[in-house]
Design a protein with these regions (language model features):
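Acidic, mature catalytic/reactive cores of soluble proteins
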Residues: 24
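Extended, hydrophobic alpha-helical segments in both membrane/secreted and soluble proteins
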Residues: 1-6, 16, 20, 174
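An acidic, gly/pro-interrupted, aromatic-rich
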Residues: 3, 10, 17, 28-167, ...
């Protein structure tokens, strides 16, 4: 496939847009991350030679995770933060993952590999707090301010965080969880959104 793509790329006068169209149209690119009993053993993370029988899950890079949180929650629009304040927040976020290499070039690299400090940061950081806030402009503010049934609000939370609607079992579980909050439903929606943003399905690229 790579040889064919290379030939066609040259023949198309190095048209990058056309190359991207070809790549995303391939079966290899469109493979599901769901595995079966037959290809469960195909796991490079376990040291096996990749057979490309399904898409391999990988964690988002720090920049990707930051941008995904912003898009999912409108965290950059909550409150009255200025553009410079938002840039400073992004810089602080990225600084947590910068690893300096002790060599002549003073190289740096960013990592996000699920360490305990990183997991705690995802649970308690300023950005997560803003993502789950109900300040004016935030996603949750818009959701709570608009009319709609409980099931619709749960659907919207799933769509924002995971780009899919909840399964029937998930919907039932979330409704039962919300019922335990009584009249404090707002806290329930905040906790639900927090849980979705901290789920593996949100953090991993499928």
């Amino acid at each position: 496939m790579l040889k064919r793509l290379a030939r066609e790329f040259v023949a198309a006068n190095y048209d990058v847009k056309q190359l991207v169209r070809w790549i995303v149209s391939t079966e290899a690119y469109q493979l599901s991350s769901q595995y079966s009993e037959k290809n469960r053993i195909d796991d490079p993370a376990a040291g096996e030679m990749p057979l490309f029988s399904h898409m391999y899950l990988k964690s988002m890079q720090a920049e990707q995770l930051y941008d995904s949180l912003i898009v999912a929650s409108n965290a950059h629009q909550s409150g009255n933060g200025s553009w410079s304040a938002q840039e400073e927040q992004r810089r602080r976020w990225m600084q947590q993952f910068v690893v300096a290499f002790d060599n002549d070039e003073n190289d740096e690299s960013t990592t996000f590999n699920g360490t305990i400090p990183q997991a705690l940061m995802m649970m308690n950081s300023e950005l997560i707090d803003k993502a789950c806030s109900v300040e004016r402009g935030s996603f949750l503010f818009e959701q709570m301010s608009s009319p709609g049934a409980e099931t619709q609000k749960i659907n919207d939370l799933y769509l924002a965080a995971l780009t899919r609607k909840p399964t029937r079992a998930e919907m039932t579980k979330m409704q039962k969880a919300l019922a335990r909050y009584g009249n404090a439903k707002l806290n329930g929606y905040q906790d639900m959104f927090w849980a979705l943003l901290n789920s593996n399905e949100f953090i991993f690229i499928h």
